[in-house]
UniProtKB/Swiss-Prot annotation:
Propeptide: 10-17
InterPro entries: PLipase_A2 (IPR001211), PLipase_A2_Asp_AS (IPR033112), PLipase_A2_dom (IPR016090), PLipase_A2_dom_sf (IPR036444), PLipase_A2_His_AS (IPR033113)
UniProt name for this protein: Basic phospholipase A2 beta-bungarotoxin A7 chain
Any Gene Ontology biological process: phospholipid metabolic process
Subcellular location: Secreted
Uppermost EC category: hydrolase
Keywords per UniProt: Calcium, Disulfide bond, Hydrolase, Lipid degradation, Lipid metabolism, Metal-binding, Neurotoxin, Presynaptic neurotoxin, Secreted, Signal, Toxin
Cysteine pairings via disulfide bonds: C44-C136, C46-C62, C61-C117, C68-C110, C78-C103, C96-C108
SMART domains listed in its UniProt record: PA2c
Source organism (scientific name): Bungarus multicinctus (Many-banded krait)
Function: Snake venom phospholipase A2 (PLA2) that inhibits neuromuscular transmission by blocking acetylcholine release from the nerve termini. PLA2 catalyzes the calcium-dependent hydrolysis of the 2-acyl groups in 3-sn-phosphoglycerides.
EC number: 3.1.1.4
Lineage: Eukaryota, Metazoa, Chordata, Craniata, Vertebrata
Organism superkingdom: Eukaryota
Keyword Cell inner membrane appears in the UniProt entry: no
């Protein structure tokens, strides 16, 4: 199937630079009928913040991604949300470039792992926009 992105035609506010890379990875791995935005407020961890126990496999992808970013932030001067990096989308996978252990490579690996996890996890409509105060303790 061929997916056509209308992202460029949408009225979308600017995002931190790294999120553009991450969004592209997500679009590459998820089913065509989904948009990256549908993953932005899902479960207890997909989107801003996070608390409690992940509610399913997809939410666990976001939980692991949050923790991965936390590890990257331990590198002096490394801000995962703004750090850009080099990568290639090819043959149903994602290749990260750069020296192992550098901020850019670690952040790319975090995003790559999460995007591939999204593509392999079931999206449950009822877990979108949940009441996090009630379900994420």
């Amino acid at each position: 199937a061929v997916c056509v992105s209308l992202l460029g035609a949408a009225n979308i506010p600017p995002h931190p630079l790294n999120l553009i890379n991450f969004m592209e990875m997500i679009r590459y791995t998820i089913p065509c009928e989904k948009t990256w935005g549908e993953y932005a407020d899902y479960g207890c961890y997909c989107g801003a913040g996070g608390s409690g126990r992940p509610i399913d496999a997809l939410d666990r992808c976001c939980y692991v991604h949050d923790n991965c970013y936390g590890e990257a932030e331990k590198i002096p001067g490394c801000n995962p949300k703004t750090k850009t990096y080099s990568y290639k989308l090819t043959k149903r996978t994602i290749i990260c470039y750069g020296a192992a252990g550098t901020c850019g490579r670690i952040v790319c690996d975090c995003d790559r792992t999460a995007a591939l996890c999204f593509g392999n996890s079931e999206y449950i409509e009822g877990h979108k926009n949940i009441d996090t105060k009630r379900h994420c303790r």
